[in-house]
Structure formats: structure tokens, C-alpha cells
């Protein structure tokens, strides 16, 4: 089993990611919307809040998607679909994708 981690820093690609997951038959996934902490702490301090406009608020938002995938082929298909869509998957300012092998508790029962 493979754990798939996706950090989407450009939320404009959310639908592309979800469609690619579905097309590659990766269904058991969780999506969490959050805040990128790179600059959030500085911008949220009352002293600095006036220096930043609302236009940059959206760049703090990130989407985290986690999934357990049964076959590497599904992840390869997911990556292929993203490349075909024109998404620059190597640009970590847009998206970061990580995978690692995991074991389930049922493997020990």
C-alpha cells in the first residue's frame, strides 16, 4: 500500500487534481483546506497587518490531499494525467507530491 500526500499551493488547480484522482481510480482520499504558514505568522501580527492587501490572502491558502493507494500504477496514471493537463508538477510553488510505502494494522493481525 502506498500513502499519497499532495500539497496544493495554487488552489486554482483543485478541480484538476480531483478529476485526475478520480480518473486514475484513487477514490479513498481526504481533502483538508488550510493555511500556508510560510508568511502567515508575520501577516497576522497586528503590527504588520496593514502592510498586506487582501489580494495576497489567497496565496496563504493550501489544500492537503492524503490517500491510500493499492497500486503504484494508479499513482503513475495520476501523474501522467496531471502532466497531460499542462500542470507543472515539478514546480513546488504550485504543487508538492510525495509517496511512501506503508503497512496497515491488518498486516500484523
Predicted regions and their residues:
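Positively charged, small/polar-rich N-terminal and surface patches that mediate targeting and assembly
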Residues: 1-109
Amino acid at each position: 500500500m502506498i500513502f499519497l500526500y499532495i500539497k496544493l499551493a495554487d488552489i486554482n488547480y483543485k478541480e484538476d487534481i480531483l478529476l485526475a484522482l478520480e480518473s486514475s481510480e484513487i477514490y479513498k482520499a481526504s481533502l483538508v483546506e488550510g493555511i500556508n504558514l510560510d508568511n502567515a505568522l508575520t501577516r497576522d501580527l497586528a503590527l504588520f497587518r496593514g502592510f498586506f492587501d487582501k489580494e495576497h490572502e489567497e496565496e496563504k491558502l493550501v489544500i492537503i490531499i492524503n490517500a491510500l493507494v493499492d497500486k503504484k500504477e494508479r499513482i503513475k496514471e495520476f501523474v501522467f494525467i496531471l502532466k497531460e493537463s499542462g500542470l507543472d508538477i515539478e514546480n513546488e510553488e504550485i504543487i508538492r507530491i510525495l509517496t511512501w510505502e506503508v503497512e496497515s494494522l491488518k498486516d500484523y493481525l
